[in-house]
Amino acid sequence: RSAWIQNNIQSNPVAADYNNRLLYHESGVDDNATSNTQPIYAYIQSSDFGIMASDQNNSGQHFGFVWRLLPDVNFNGSTVSNPQVTMALYPRQNSGTAYGTTDLNPVVSSQNYAFPTPQEYTVQQFTGEVYTRLRGRQMAFKCYSDTIGTAWQLGTNRYDVKQDGRR
């Protein structure tokens, strides 16, 4: 977008792009800039936050095990019959380490017990709870969609956490 105007004559903001097209914003749920409708990649991502909220006196001393996510999302305004979003959880063992890594020596085994990072879960309109397996001191959260006709609003998700070890 190269130029914008908030016009009182029209109800939506108007922008011009580099292909000499006028784009009307905040109208509909898809990208209609061309004749071929495209989905809008919409997301919101948190910064890192401590998993063990009750660990106020010894902040960061305990690992937390997130075993359930209670999503709070609505799909008001969606134009498809089964809208969905993806919720991704990014665990961090220590500040400054990469997401999903640990500073412990790996267990030697013929099986791969590692969980992918991020852990992604599909959430639909009537998803009441999502069972997870996530361990760490901190985590970040991302909610996104990339499908045509999907509009969503994120509320306050809740997580069920158990204390899971100490450093």
Predicted segments with their positions:
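Beta-sheet repeat architectures centered on beta-propellers
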Residues: 1-167
